Swiss-Prot record:
Member of a network of 50S ribosomal subunit biogenesis factors which assembles along the 30S-50S interface, preventing incorrect 23S rRNA structures from forming. Promotes peptidyl transferase center (PTC) maturation. One of its GO terms (cellular component) is cytosol. It holds the Pfam family DarP. One of its GO terms (biological process) is assembly of large subunit precursor of preribosome. This is Dual-action ribosomal maturation protein DarP. Disulfide bonds: none annotated. It comes from Stenotrophomonas maltophilia (strain R551-3). Its main location: cytoplasm. NCBIfam families: PRK05255.1-1.
Amino acid sequence: MRGRDEETGEFHDKSRSQNRRDALDVLALGEKLVSLTPAQLARLPVPEDLLPHIAECKRITAHIAHKRQLAFLAKHMRREEDATLDAIRDALDANSETGRREVAMMHRAEDWRERLLAEGDKALAALLDDYPQADRQQLRTLVRNAQAEKAKNKPPRAYREIFQVLRTLMLPAALGLKASDDEVEADDTADASDED
């Protein structure tokens, strides 16, 4: 029953303004879902019955028709449980945070690559201080090859390879992952031999 509670004087239901704000939040969430790539969308806990509506909204490009289809998508989304929509929002927030960390890591890898090419062994020593698991000889060879390629105006194969090596080196730390299983096993073996 709508209206006020006779004893407490509080409203029984949400106000129209609150309902409108909730509907606009769902519409904004729908816009985010439509803007995602299929791979990003597959990682989210989106109910199966919403996927065709999202695909249809992506397909329509005419402004007014797109807006109307987006409103239709939001209407279907409002029928979902609040917990489902909250799970989608949480997953979107986690994806955006992971994406920001990956971009920051890539910038760091590019900076290290430029520093390695400019400073040589001095920068390599600093890199090994930060990342002791790095292969010194491999990086030194790649830096030397990249400098030679640049001097001879050859395609920058080693230059790209330095970035790939740095990326694989920095990615676990950027994403907050533990060391690789091989490193953990090596540490466990070393600990077991210390105990004997």
